Curated annotation (Swiss-Prot):
Family stated for the protein in its record: Belongs to the UPF0150 family.
Residues forming coiled coils: none
InterPro entries registered for this protein in UniProt: HicB-like (IPR031807), TA_system_antitoxin (IPR051404), TTHA1013/TTHA0281-like (IPR035069)
Identification of the protein by name: UPF0150 protein jhp_0960
Organism: Helicobacter pylori (strain J99 / ATCC 700824)
Length: 72
């Protein structure tokens, strides 16, 4: 299963979250650590789901698309 996670740099390191897994967040001092940590968080999150919830997620097809906005 391919899941999109967002990893953002902040003043304390890196913050990671999965937009469609409510509450699935993690962090790390480096990008690599945040990536490892969010992967573990996703695995734990999915491990707590029921079979029908997992089936729904496996059918979910989302795209992260960059959108350019003209802002005055």
């Amino acid at each position: 299963m391919l899941i999109n996670a967002v990893i953002e740099k902040d003043e304390n390191g890196y913050f990671a979250f999965v937009p469609f897994l409510k509450g699935c967040v993690s962090q790390g001092k480096s990008y690599e650590e945040a990536l490892r940590n969010i992967k573990e968080a996703i695995e734990l999150y999915l491990g707590d789901l029921e079979a029908d919830e997992l089936a729904f997620l496996s059918k979910k097809n989302s795209v992260i698309a960059p959108i350019e906005i003209a802002f005055a």
